[in-house]
Amino acid sequence: MQSSTSAVIEKTEKYGAKNYHPLPIVISEAKGVWVKDPEGRKYLDMLSAYSAVNQGHCHPKIIQALKDQADKITLTSRAFHNDQLAPFYEKVSKLTGKNMLLPMNTGAEAVETAVKAARRWAYDVKGVPDNQAEIIVCEDNFHGRTMTAVSLSSNDEYKRGFGPMLPGIKVIPYGDLEALKAAITSHTAAFLVEPIQGEAGIRIPQEGFLKEAYALCKRENVLFIADEIQSGLGRSGKWFACDWEDVKPDMYILGKALGGGVFPISVVCADRDILGVFEPGSHGSTFGGNPLACAVSIAALEVLEEEKLVERSYEYGNYLLTKLKEIDNPIIKDVRGRGLFIGVELHEPARKYCEQLKEEGLLCKETHETVIRFAPPLVISKEDLDWAIEKIYYVLKP
């Protein structure tokens, strides 16, 4: 017999570490953009597991790929080749235009991989003295929860009690080209940036920043690394958020929707002159590039292509953004976004509004305390989007 919502939450609170503060809802079933709790109540998902479910929950093609591959082989480790890794490599290489890839499992692992690659490149190729390489990042970034990722963060709460932090990191204001110029030295290995900052509240740098920052990095022989874990794969209305400024970074970091919301997989994409610094034994992952993840990822990318979800994100994102900007309420400070990646910033904490929306059957989550993030699966229909807009109007209109 299925447990009730209250029973599940009670048991979760009893045994689980308190490193999350979820809304009081239990999801036991999901399909497309709709989810259900144990009592059968339906909710429209406007979070998409932080953009990991761009293709919708339990997409039949992706689930079938999982089932088919699970009947054959799931894990070989990288001690042997597997027959799914090569087609995965080829698919992602064609998508990104990069000729060398390194697969991992989670986004944070891929960030770790990119930082390791940048540092070794700085020593082996650029000629930076040993142990003096520097990585430049932006204030309010979010690159994960591992030690490297929290060392990159400017959020003191993410760091509290976890020191000492990784050295060799400089933090500049997001979107500040002059600060980037001032931070670069002969020891700078890379500039790591989110083209749209998700956890910071869907922050978009001023127009031209990415292009100018990339050009600056090229002039100074600094790697430009784009963390597209959340903003990539159609979420922003383009394949990659960098595409809004026609920037092709030296390194892409991809994750989340790369696994179609079904299986974790991430990847660092660059060219041979960068990722070629790795040699056998210098980096690895038992599960990285496993056949199950690769088969799922190929299907996930095919769904984005075949169902034109990038184009849908662009069209419906513009529609949703326009509708949200029409809400006339003094508590709203700003409405911003690209594609189906939209933030409504308030003059007060957003949590209570997310809780009210939950009661209306719409699931979203506050970020950066005062921002409501709206990021539904890209498969959302116009009808369902209009239903969501109606609920948002009901909660946010004065």
Swiss-Prot record:
User: Which GO terms label this protein's molecular function in UniProt?
Assistant: identical protein binding; ornithine aminotransferase activity; pyridoxal phosphate binding
Q: Where in the cell is it found?
A: Cytoplasm
CDD domains assigned: OAT_like
UniProt enzyme class = transferase
Q: Required cofactors, per record?
A: pyridoxal 5'-phosphate
Cellular component GO terms, alphabetically?
cytoplasm
Please give the catalytic activity noted in the UniProt record. a 2-oxocarboxylate + L-ornithine = L-glutamate 5-semialdehyde + an L-alpha-amino acid
Under which EC number(s) is this enzyme classified?
A: 2.6.1.13
Output the superkingdom of the source species: Bacteria
* Keyword tags: Amino-acid biosynthesis, Aminotransferase, Cytoplasm, Proline biosynthesis, Pyridoxal phosphate, Transferase
Q: Which residues carry this modification: N6-(pyridoxal phosphate)lysine?
A: 256
Query: PROSITE patterns in the record, alphabetically?
Result: AA_TRANSFER_CLASS_3
Q: In which pathway does it act?
A: Amino-acid biosynthesis; L-proline biosynthesis; L-glutamate 5-semialdehyde from L-ornithine: step 1/1
Task: Name its GO BP terms in alphabetical order.
Answer: L-proline biosynthetic process
Among InterPro entries, the record links this protein to: Aminotrans_3 (IPR005814), Aminotrans_3_PPA_site (IPR049704), Class-III_PLP-dep_AT (IPR050103), Orn_aminotrans (IPR010164), Ornith_aminotrans_bact (IPR034757), PyrdxlP-dep_Trfase (IPR015424), PyrdxlP-dep_Trfase_major (IPR015421), PyrdxlP-dep_Trfase_small (IPR015422)
- Pfam family membership, one: Aminotran_3
Q: Give the family from UniProt.
A: Belongs to the class-III pyridoxal-phosphate-dependent aminotransferase family. OAT subfamily.
The function of this protein is: Catalyzes the interconversion of ornithine to glutamate semialdehyde.
Its recorded name reads: Ornithine aminotransferase
Which gene name does the record give? rocD
